Amino acid sequence: MTEPHVTVIGAGLAGSEAAWQAARLGVKVTLYEMRPHVTTAVHRTGLFAELVCSNSLRGAGLENAVGLLKEEMRRLGSLILREALQHAVPAGGALAVSREEFAAGVTAALTSHPNITVVREEVREIPPDGVVVIASGPLTSAPLAEAIRRFTGEESLAFYDAAAPIVNIETVNMDKVFRMSRYGKGEGDDYLNCPLTREEYEAFYEALVTAEKAMPHNPEDAQVCFFEGCLPVEEIARRGPDALRYGPMKPVGLIDPRTGRRPWAVVQLRQDNAAGTLYNMVGFQTSLKWSEQKRVFRMIPGLEEAEFERYGVIHRNTFMKSPRLLYPTGESRQRAGLFFAGQMTGVEGYVESAAGGLVAGINAARRALGLEPVTFPRETAIGSLLHYITHADPEHFQPMNIAFGLMPPLEGPKIRDKRARKRAISERALDVLAAWAPGHLGAPLLD
């Protein structure tokens, strides 16, 4: 009798989670990762689950949709959440991680698992048989991307994504910045804040909107747009002189202890590694040329002599028309046993990508074991996210973060307090998941 087996292509957040979930269910997994032998424009290492943009997994509370999504995943035994919590760094009310330690932890867990065999090579074609999870990401290599296009018969959609610069903390002028979390969240001093006066802000704004960009010049990219949730800072600025002050440079919830007043605008720096030597510029993903980044960002008080350990970069992300191609189980409508997961399916965000991998990994293992895939309840964040990407209008399909608006409304009288209403939705989700999991996944949730 053939031993149950799953092939996972890609060891990013989704692929790593898929491999882990399948292996936990007793299935043998072959995990393919092309890095470091074949790399991409934005990856720097051969580690699994490397974070190429922010180091933040966003909000942590149950009044936040992504906080609920993370809690569901944690209770389901998510490797990504386990390692994120293990390697968390101070970030106020958010969950941020030490980038390299997190990726190293994920890599170690997968390479040491007795049910997982890692193969470091590029996969250029979709395996013709067996149970397969494709989680090769938005930067899928050209040969595999073409193979997926041939299989689906659909042209991929695309958008630009960008990452923020990282600075060496030793080169920040600490006399000009102050430590404080917005509204005192977290430990109260998790962020470094670079305050700007009105005059400094206006000069910075003018320099930013006139700086030279480093956009790709491929004709095929002419119509590609940015994902709204990850707009480059210069694109936000072009929406109006005050757009930044209501976006990544908003000063609300911050008082400069040296003046006793709220600054006109603020640039926040968030710890990027466990040692506290690297900080990233929060919300400052950018498509500017590197020389322009150095010139413009050094206008920010405290960063006049800053050394950038990584400049912001831009890259092209591709995704599928999942409403036409996938079931809410992550399985292909065209071929039983073939699953897709991660950002390439039209979810946006680290946590959302990993959640898709969790679903695909569980269901791929079930297929390998001769069981039917399961669809997560709509009342859960996981179920609502997978329902959205497989039921949205395919002609106007765009990447989506998890949001409470994707979830069914509460029954009964409306709860008018927004925070209470969101928490009630989260509590309902966790109750439904707890009741559903034992009968459908064969095991209770983690505490």
Curated annotation (Swiss-Prot):
GO molecular function, one term: tRNA (uracil(54)-C5)-methyltransferase activity, 5,10-methylenetetrahydrofolate-dependent
GO CC terms, sorted: cytosol
UniProt family annotation: Belongs to the MnmG family. TrmFO subfamily.
Entries under SUPFAM superfamilies matching the protein: FAD/NAD(P)-binding domain
GO biological process, one term: tRNA wobble uridine modification
Protein name, UniProt field: Methylenetetrahydrofolate--tRNA-(uracil-5-)-methyltransferase TrmFO
Cofactor(s) named in the record: FAD
Alphabetized NCBIfam families for the sequence: gid_trmFO (TIGR00137), PRK05335.1 (NF003739)
Keyword Calcium: no
Superkingdom of origin: Bacteria
Coiled coil residues, start to end: none
Keyword annotations from UniProtKB, A to Z: Cytoplasm, FAD, Flavoprotein, Methyltransferase, NAD, NADP, Transferase, tRNA processing
Entry's localization field: Cytoplasm
Lineage start: Bacteria, Bacillati, Bacillota, Clostridia, Eubacteriales
E.C. numbers: 2.1.1.74
Statement: the UniProt record of this protein carries the keyword rRNA processing: no
Residues at which FAD binds: G10, A11, G12, L13, A14, G15
Reaction(s) catalysed by this chain's protein: uridine(54) in tRNA + (6R)-5,10-methylene-5,6,7,8-tetrahydrofolate + NADH + H(+) = 5-methyluridine(54) in tRNA + (6S)-5,6,7,8-tetrahydrofolate + NAD(+); uridine(54) in tRNA + (6R)-5,10-methylene-5,6,7,8-tetrahydrofolate + NADPH + H(+) = 5-methyluridine(54) in tRNA + (6S)-5,6,7,8-tetrahydrofolate + NADP(+)
Enzyme class: transferase
InterPro entries: FAD/NAD-bd_sf, MnmG-rel, MnmG-rel_CS, MnmG_N, TrmFO
Role of this protein: Catalyzes the folate-dependent formation of 5-methyl-uridine at position 54 (M-5-U54) in all tRNAs.
Disulfide bonds listed in the record: none
